[in-house]
Amino acid sequence: MGTIICIGGLVGLKNKEKVFIPYSPRKIDFEIMKLSTKVNPKVLFIGTASSEREDYYISFKNAYESLGAIVENLCVLNNNITFEEIRKKILSSDIIYVGCGKTKFMMDVWKSKGIDKCLIEAYKKDIILAGMSAGSYCWFKYNYEMIEGLDLIHMINCVHYDEKSKEKKKQFYDNIKKNNLRGIAIDNDASLIFSGTDYKIVKNYENSKAYDIVFEDGKYIEKEII
């Protein structure tokens, strides 16, 4: 089975007007590229969750091209792309990176287009999967709001954890207990690299963290992943 990189978010990805701006690659980006054995890996960006915003794709493309990647964009909205074309693009990639945005919208589009099936197939073929925010949620069984993902990681995920309100953290904790599932919380500028049942943290800054949360023996146990 493949490798999945789940990113909690990136500070400074947008300006005050919510426009995606150029950014310099950070430690997590370098780590994603290192996971490929190729000098110039083919990286497929999937921006469904942001409604395929061009400014987001350009920002991502420039960052990853500076690392030597050959970057392509998967656009499925407002065009006549076929399932066969989608599948070919996905399975011919070395790395697939799913961007941030609206999780439920993204998952609904994926199911209608068959993208979900293609990504599961890519995982089985050891294609590297990565993503941020909604692009992290999609690999898990659920996100903290119980939006269903692809269940490649049989846990509940909460991203942007360092800026979540008490109410949203409570919702996350409640759903861990109700569903008897392990929870994974990831701060902005932190990521977890999953390989099978093992995972490790990679972070851009020392104060960015991730947590493993379970409900056992009538209480919650939250452990920082180090």
Predicted regions and their residues:
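A general structural motif
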Residues: 1, 38-43, 93, 126
